[in-house]
């Protein structure tokens, strides 16, 4: 048994990885900021100790896992060096862990977490699968043959991984504080593709994914008959979305997903492709797909009277559009109200017009102050720059949250990757609703 200390244990990936090592029988603790982060619930439920940052947390015979947001001059990392301990970066450690399994990486600019959550749930319907999801959820199942995990492209961290399979949901320009342009993003994915051992499952409509140059098979999925795996005869029902799946031009089977929106059908196709390639029982896969309940902060719903209140991680224009589309398809008779908190100044600056365009698809828009990151907490623009681009939009905070009560028959979308949950919590308190994130 190894004693692990995670520096930045509340980070979504770090939280997941800490839970996995705990499940596999190791002693695990970690440190982070003292303010509430939704990932800490799962850690506390497993009895994993969360400490405030302090050099004295680091003791002899520990292995220290260093979160990517924390520099080498962090007090705990400095102490670990003084004690000559093993210090391993998060992505390097995860790269080591996956080598023990048949591994499936899920990467892409958008849809990673939802697809990884679906993949782990569906695969566990047929084969024991450990998993790491970017919503702070992780599980290490002793005796697992498979490992499903989320692989982030930021700073090319995913190049530490050599998975058996990779699902690539899309390539898009994001993280403008690191990537120069879309070609730089493509270069990162091309290099990641070269690390994959058995096969790549990629969205067929993505022009950049179509250019991948590898020696292993690439299976494209989508809605076109030219794709290797595609969906036809899509029907939206009260139970969800039903569709037929064709593989290499031949009918495979009919599936029902409890989710709505084309992006969720695409996620399901990618997962079905993996199960097909690994010869999993299709009846088990169908049954598992029906019972998928979603992942944290991805269209998580709470119904209060005639309002549907949604907590969602959407923080890029395309993700916002997809979330609004889901609300429209699932609740066509309701208005859609967007409450959005931009995440990082660099992303807000880079996609200012795109944010305005995607948010304008809602019936009413409320905006919060821009949320900075640990690496970047100031910028040259303000939230007023976005407000001025969206007709009828207005600023909202915890003190003015009661304005949302006037939208009687509506879906209220709380979207963002920062601390938008503070507003959501304030609104629930205003409504007298108890909700544990």
Swiss-Prot record:
The record's annotation in NCBIfam families points to:
murC
HAMAP family, per this entry? MurC (MF_00046)
EC number(s) on file:
6.3.2.8
InterPro entries the UniProt entry points to: Mur-like_cat_sf, Mur_ligase_C, Mur_ligase_C_dom_sf, Mur_ligase_cen, Mur_ligase_N, MurCDEF_pg_biosynth, UDP-N-AcMur_Ala_ligase_MurC
- Please give the Pfam families that the UniProt record associates with this protein: Mur_ligase (PF01225), Mur_ligase_C (PF02875), Mur_ligase_M (PF08245)
Ligand binding (ATP): 108-114
What is the name of the protein in this document? UDP-N-acetylmuramate--L-alanine ligase
Q: Which gene encodes it?
A: murC
Leader sequence segment: none
GO CC list: cytoplasm
Relate the protein's function as given in its record. Cell wall formation.
Pathway assignment reads: Cell wall biogenesis; peptidoglycan biosynthesis
Q: What is its main location?
A: cytoplasm
Give one GO molecular function term: UDP-N-acetylmuramate-L-alanine ligase activity
Q: Tell me, which GO biological process terms does this entry list?
A: cell division; cell wall organization; peptidoglycan biosynthetic process; regulation of cell shape
- Enumerate the subcellular locations listed in this protein's record, separating them with semicolons: Cytoplasm
Keywords from the UniProt entry: ATP-binding, Cell cycle, Cell division, Cell shape, Cell wall biogenesis/degradation, Cytoplasm, Ligase, Nucleotide-binding, Peptidoglycan synthesis
Which top EC class is named for this enzyme in its record?
ligase
Q: State the reactions this protein catalyses.
A: UDP-N-acetyl-alpha-D-muramate + L-alanine + ATP = UDP-N-acetyl-alpha-D-muramoyl-L-alanine + ADP + phosphate + H(+)
Q: Which organism is it from?
A: Staphylococcus epidermidis (strain ATCC 35984 / DSM 28319 / BCRC 17069 / CCUG 31568 / BM 3577 / RP62A)
Its family? Answer: Belongs to the MurCDEF family.
């Amino acid at each position: 048994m190894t004693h692990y200390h995670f520096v930045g244990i509340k980070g979504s990936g770090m939280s997941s990885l800490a839970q996995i090592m705990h499940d596999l029988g190791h002693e695990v603790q970690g440190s982070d900021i003292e303010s509430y982060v939704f990932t800490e619930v799962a850690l506390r439920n497993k009895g994993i100790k969360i400490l405030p940052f302090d050099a004295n947390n680091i003791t002899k015979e520990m292995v220290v896992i260093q979160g990517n947001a924390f520099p080498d001059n962090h007090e705990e990392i400095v102490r670990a060096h003084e004690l000559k301990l093993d210090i391993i970066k998060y992505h390097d450690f995860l790269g080591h862990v996956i080598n023990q399994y048949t591994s499936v990486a899920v990467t892409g600019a958008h849809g990673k977490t939802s697809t990884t959550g679906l993949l782990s749930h569906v695969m566990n319907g047929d084969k024991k699968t450990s998993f790491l999801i970017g919503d702070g959820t992780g599980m290490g199942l002793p005796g697992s043959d498979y490992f499903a995990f989320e692989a982030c492209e930021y700073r090319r961290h995913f190049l530490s991984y050599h998975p058996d399979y990779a699902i690539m949901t899309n390539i898009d320009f994001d993280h403008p504080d690191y990537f120069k342009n879309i070609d730089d993003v493509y270069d990162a994915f091309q290099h990641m593709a070269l690390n994959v051992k058995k096969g790549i499952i990629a969205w067929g409509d993505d022009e950049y994914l179509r250019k991948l140059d590898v020696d292993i098979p690439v299976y494209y999925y989508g809605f076109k008959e030219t794709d290797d795996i595609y969906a036809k005869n899509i029907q939206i029902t009260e139970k969800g979305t039903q569709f037929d799946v064709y593989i290499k031009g031949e009918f495979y089977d009919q599936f029902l997903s409890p989710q709505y929106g084309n992006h969720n059908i695409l996620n399901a196709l990618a997962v079905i492709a993996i199960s097909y390639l690994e010869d999993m029982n299709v009846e088990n896969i169908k049954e598992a797909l029906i019972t998928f309940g979603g992942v944290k902060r991805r269209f998580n719903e709470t119904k209060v009277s005639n309002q549907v209140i949604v907590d969602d991680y959407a923080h890029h224009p395309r993700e916002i559009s997809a979330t609004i589309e889901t609300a429209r398809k699932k609740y066509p008779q309701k208005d859609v109200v967007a409450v959005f908190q931009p995440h990082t100044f660099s992303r807000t600056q880079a996609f200012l017009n795109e944010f305005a365009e995607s948010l304008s698809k809602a019936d009413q828009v409320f905006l919060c102050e821009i949320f900075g990151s640990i690496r970047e907490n100031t910028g040259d623009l303000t939230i007023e720059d976005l407000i001025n681009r969206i007709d009828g939009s207005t600023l909202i905070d915890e003190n003015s949250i009661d304005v949302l009560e006037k939208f009687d028959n509506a879906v209220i979308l709380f979207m963002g990757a920062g601390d938008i949950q503070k507003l959501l919590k304030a609104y629930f308190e205003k409504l007298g609703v108890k909700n544990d994130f």
